[in-house]
């Protein structure tokens, strides 16, 4: 059995959460010529749960190929993807502050879902879990939205906000997994790791 795993994610939050589980990990980041963002394209009429699970599998496929291509020591690879959904509408990462403003206006004064899929796999075995949480935003003023969008924090975040950042001031209620909303659900990830023989 391997003594460590690879984390195929550029998210510092996921790395921090994984470290809390006590499992040693090494980053397995995309090569410069890999278009990682292209994997996140939404298919027509794709449901949010199907989308986030498909993208996570694509990320795992790409990471396992990367591992083989680089000739690195074999070990399980962990991938994760988070998306925000209002009904069937998927909110990915905003392209700029104006896009973040548009997303936040739509999410203001609503309860939306945050779906995080996690996959752990090797060339011979793979497992996947899905964690769904709900977040309720209060009614945000235009000034609050514009100030937050201009802060830069929404960039690179699904739904244009970070639950562990300034956006917490707008969240009136949440249910489910706080770590899942951050990007790596601890309970479900621990279950995956245990299924691969890791002691968590």
UniProtKB/Swiss-Prot annotation:
Where in the sequence is the active site?
81 (proton acceptor)
Query: Under which EC number(s) is this enzyme classified?
Result: 3.6.1.9
Q: Where is the signal peptide?
A: none
GO molecular-function terms, A-Z? dTTP diphosphatase activity; monoatomic cation transmembrane transporter activity; UTP diphosphatase activity
- Protein's UniProt keywords contain rRNA-binding: no
Stored HAMAP family: Maf
User: What compartments host this protein?
Assistant: Cytoplasm
Could you give a single Gene Ontology term from the biological process aspect?
A: potassium ion transport
Site feature (Important for substrate specificity) residues? 13, 82, 164
* GO cellular component labels: cytoplasm
NCBIfam families tied to this protein? maf (TIGR00172)
Output the lineage of the source organism.
Bacteria, Pseudomonadati, Pseudomonadota, Betaproteobacteria, Burkholderiales
What catalytic activity is recorded?
A: dTTP + H2O = dTMP + diphosphate + H(+); UTP + H2O = UMP + diphosphate + H(+)
Pfam families the UniProt entry points to: Maf
Going by the UniProt record, its keywords in alphabetical order are: Cytoplasm, Hydrolase, Nucleotide metabolism
Q: What is the annotated role of this protein in its UniProt record?
A: Nucleoside triphosphate pyrophosphatase that hydrolyzes dTTP and UTP. May have a dual role in cell division arrest and in preventing the incorporation of modified nucleotides into cellular nucleic acids.
- Disulfide linkages recorded for this protein, renumbered to the chain, are none
Q: What family name appears in the similarity comment?
A: Belongs to the Maf family. YhdE subfamily.
Q: Output the superkingdom of the source species.
A: Bacteria
Q: Which protein, by its recorded name, is this?
A: dTTP/UTP pyrophosphatase
Cofactor(s) recorded in Swiss-Prot or TrEMBL = a divalent metal cation
